[in-house]
C-alpha cells in the first residue's frame, strides 16, 4: 500500500488559526450594540441642533430689526410732543390706535368745533325743531325769562315751592326785620308757626302725621303719639 504524503505541520497550523478566530467573532453577541449606537447618535444630533439654534438667536439679537424700530418723538409746530407712528399709512388707517398721540402740550387745546366730531354728529339724536313765528305776525316776541339757578338758599314763594304731603321742608335763615335789635334776643328770631319757641337754626318741619306715615311704611307702630 503506497504511503500517502503527509502535509507539513506548518501548513496545518496555518489552517487551524483562521478557523478559531472566526469562531471567536461569531460567539461575541453584537445584537444589543445597534440600538445603543442609534440612541447615542440621536442624542448627539439633538445637542448639535439645539446648540446651532441657540447660537443663531444669540448672534441675531444684537442686530436691530428694521421693521420693529423704536418710536421717535417729534416736536410739532404747535408746541406738542408727538409719537411718530412706526406703521405704514395703510396700517394706521385700518388701526384706530395707531395714530399719533400728543404727550406734552405747551398751550391749551383748541376749543371744540360747534358741530362736534363726525362720530358725535352721527350718533347724536335728532334735534327737536323749535317752532318759528309766522312771518305775518309783526309783534316782537320775547323769549320767556328763565330764573337763574342758584346754589345758595333764597326765600321761595308759594308758587315756586308747593307743599307736598310726606315731604320735609327746611326753613332758611331770614334777615332781621329791625336793625336795632340785638343779636340773640328773642325778637330777632322768627317764631315757628303755631309755637312760641324761636327758630334758632335750620330745622325740618315735620308733623306727627308725617312721622306716623313713615312708621307705617316701615311696618312698625309709633309709640307715644
Swiss-Prot record:
Keyword annotations: Membrane, Phosphoprotein, Transmembrane, Transmembrane helix
PANTHER family registered for this protein in UniProt: TRANSMEMBRANE PROTEIN C16ORF54
Residue ranges of region Disordered? 107-149
Q: What do the Gene Ontology cellular component annotations say?
A: membrane
User: Can you say what this protein is called?
Assistant: Transmembrane protein C16orf54 homolog
In which broad location class does this protein mainly occur, judging by the first location in its UniProt entry? membrane
Sites where Phosphothreonine occurs are at: 113, 117
Localization recorded for this chain is: Membrane
Any Pfam family: DUF4689
The scientific name of the source species is: Rattus norvegicus (Rat)
Q: Which residues carry this modification: Phosphoserine?
A: 195
Give the membrane topology, semicolon-separated if more than one.
Single-pass membrane protein
TM regions (residue ranges): 34-54
Amino acid at each position: 500500500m503506497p504511503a500517502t504524503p503527509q502535509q507539513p505541520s506548518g501548513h496545518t497550523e496555518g489552517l487551524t488559526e483562521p478557523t478559531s478566530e472566526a469562531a471567536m467573532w461569531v460567539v461575541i453577541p453584537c445584537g444589543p450594540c445597534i440600538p445603543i449606537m442609534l440612541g447615542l447618535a440621536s442624542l448627539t444630533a439633538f445637542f448639535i441642533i439645539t446648540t446651532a439654534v441657540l447660537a443663531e438667536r444669540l448672534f441675531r439679537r444684537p442686530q436691530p430689526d428694521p421693521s420693529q424700530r423704536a418710536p421717535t418723538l417729534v416736536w410739532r409746530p404747535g408746541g406738542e410732543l408727538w409719537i411718530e407712528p412706526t406703521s405704514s399709512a395703510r396700517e394706521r388707517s385700518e388701526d384706530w390706535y395707531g395714530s399719533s398721540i400728543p404727550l406734552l402740550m405747551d398751550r391749551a387745546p383748541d376749543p371744540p368745533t360747534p358741530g362736534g366730531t363726525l362720530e358725535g354728529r352721527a350718533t347724536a339724536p335728532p334735534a327737536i325743531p323749535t317752532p318759528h313765528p309766522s312771518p305775518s305776525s309783526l309783534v316782537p316776541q320775547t323769549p320767556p325769562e328763565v330764573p337763574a339757578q342758584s346754589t345758595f338758599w333764597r326765600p321761595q314763594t308759594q308758587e315756586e315751592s308747593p307743599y307736598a304731603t310726606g315731604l320735609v321742608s327746611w326753613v332758611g335763615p331770614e334777615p332781621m326785620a329791625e336793625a336795632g335789635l340785638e343779636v340773640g334776643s328773642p325778637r330777632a328770631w322768627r317764631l315757628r308757626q303755631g309755637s312760641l319757641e324761636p327758630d334758632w337754626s335750620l330745622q325740618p318741619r315735620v308733623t306727627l302725621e308725617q312721622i306716623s306715615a313713615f312708621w307705617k311704611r316701615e311696618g312698625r307702630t309709633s309709640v307715644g303719639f
